[in-house]
């Protein structure tokens, strides 16, 4: 059920991004629309209790597809999104069947619905952080301001306020290492099929580390985003990696301070809980 809802939101985000790009929406208008979508989808994701939580992946899909040229038809983008979601759902269902065979007595309890005050507060953090990050990205003149918005969304989506602060720092460290790896990989002229296998391998490595070592995961996941961008809209490698590093710094720093300034009570509760568990 949760995967289905997430797949629907992802497909709608892709289609919405393609439509926005087709109308030539960019700059300030795109930042405004993306910020509004992030706030709304934050509420939707929390109400549906989706995991990973928050609008991070949906806003990334929307902003990325809206920011690059698309010469195909809308139905092609929609079909690609729906087909990808379908494959993911089938794989998820197969995993569920396997789990029932290997762990028949295991029951997965659904997470409780958060308090509405917390849901609205979290949505507000996304709106403030992404709005500021996108605005600074536009004013800076860098070429991919939505990267700053994605970098701002990632720490806020972390479990716990303290975890969000740590993730903001890890986001910067991992991205810096990732852009160095990207620069090295882009010295090679990859054929389309070779690039597809490389991206799949990097994505797999990123998923292996994303839960336990977030900064290491970004070393592999950063080249995925940048090499796909380079494939769709080629440009100077130096500009590409510099934009990624700078805009990630903008977004992560903004997220750090938004979390720091709006979660004082929550962080105190987390510290108290950790002390209780330790004792």
Question: How would you label these PLM feature ranges?
Answer:
Residues 1-220, 228-279:
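Alpha-helical transmembrane segments and their membrane-interface boundaries
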